[in-house]
Amino acid sequence: MPRSANLRERILKVAGEKFLSQGFYKVSVDSLVAELRTSKSSIYKFFSSKEDLVATLVDQLNGIINRQLQQIVDHADLGFEDKLLQITRFTGKLLGLVSERFLEDLRIHTPDLWESYQRERQRRIQTYYRRLFEQGIREGLIRDDIDLQLIILAYLQLTELTVQTDELSELPYSGEEVYEHITTLFLEGTLSAG
């Protein structure tokens, strides 16, 4: 890997770790420079601004999520329950890595980026979860007497809780735990008796 590409990847790795765990608003570019042992000009060679760096990280995060969901949903040897379990574990792990502070910073300090992130999350649910729920219906594990679009809309609204940091901070649960509880709550209303 060329040296400049390596530096770009290192910047993304260090910034990603800091931003996702601590949020990005209070993490200074100077602190990234110190940790990377490089200069501001080196960072700005790849990213025009801190917001550009955050946008690149969000794109990277969306790519990781989409690839993993695609891989799980496309796995021909897995049934609905196994796919659901893998998706729940993956999402729970992801929510453990992405702090409430990061999501709050996105919402407050970069509203356009937040809206873009939300649109991608909604598109992801419409795409991958639709396919998952369709499989569950075919396997007789999800009720077929409820409109699929309504199931997806309900799921989308319930999972919105995992990114609403104001409401989440009032609960004694991590984002990961909230997601697990939401999934359980949701499925007990959609699973068939047989």
Describe the residue ranges of each PLM region.
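Basic, helix-initiating cap at the start of DNA-binding domains
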Residues: M1-Q22, K26-T38, D52
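Short amphipathic alpha-helical segment with a characteristic S/N-K-E followed by hydrophobic residues
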Residues: I11, S49-A55, I64
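Short hydrophobic/aromatic patch on the recognition helix
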Residues: R37-F47
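Hydrophobic alpha-helical connector segments
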Residues: T56, Q60, Q70-V98, I152-Y155
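All-alpha amphipathic helical-bundle segments outside canonical DNA-binding/catalytic cores
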Residues: E81-D82, E120, R138-A154, Y173-E177, ...
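C-terminal peripheral helix-coil segments that are non-catalytic and often amphipathic
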Residues: Q86, K93, T127, R131-E139, ...
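Short secondary-structure transition hinges
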Residues: G92, G96-R130
